[in-house]
């Protein structure tokens, strides 16, 4: 019996320590509004009141009943690779269902402007630096936001869609399964032959200049052919940019769409990018 009695205080100590750690990390879902645009966000706040903020943006899920799950999962994915545990993470549950590609940038922008201008008052904190990070369509979102508002740095993993003309032509020719992005555009404007400009202006290839903050692009070179088809052109256009802040590319052989979360090299680059701007 004596060993068990001796072990009890130690077990109690670790349980108390666990409780203290959990209470120092607050997680809440909040509906915010900025300029009359509403969007849900998930906030993961560490202890302390002077905080750097990492805003993260999920990939495509198509239906809005999956948005909250995607926002929470994306928060966890980025939290797992983030070395600095003293950053507040804000995951933006931007909508998708029945919206044309890019129309949800307004909700993402509202979240960013809320963090910039209202989070301090609403949460009782001091916001220091603000970073944006996105995966897939979330990478599309943060790249576009980087042409609109200055931040302290942006990370985009496998951003897309890069080229809606190419992608939607494949769908029109039954080469790949139909997607909501192309179907919605076709229903409103006609196909890529009838209205190519509409598809071009919503493609990420159309947003390759005017970056207001340094940006790191991460791309797995075993990603889907649709992504890799336009990747060299996208990279070339950005490298030719004359009014962009510093741009970095990390291309990873042997990694697919989620390279940022699976590659040790990508994780290191992600943290170095953030830490060098603290």
Features from the language model and the residues they span:
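C-terminal catalytic histidine-bearing segment of alpha/beta-hydrolase fold enzymes
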Residues: 101, 232-278
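Short alpha-helix in the alpha/beta-hydrolase fold that links the catalytic acid
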Residues: 69, 213, 227-238
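Acidic catalytic loop of the alpha/beta-hydrolase fold
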Residues: 222-226
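Short substrate-entry loop that stabilizes the transition state in hydrolases
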Residues: 50-51, 60-99
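N-terminal cap/lid segment of alpha/beta-hydrolase-fold proteins
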Residues: 24-48
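Short beta-strand/loop motif that positions the catalytic acidic residue
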Residues: 211, 217-219
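Mobile cap/lid helix-loop segments that gate and shape the active-site cleft of serine hydrolases
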Residues: 68, 159, 165-207
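Gly/Ser-rich "nucleophile elbow"/oxyanion-hole loop immediately N-terminal to the catalytic nucleophile
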Residues: 113-136, 148
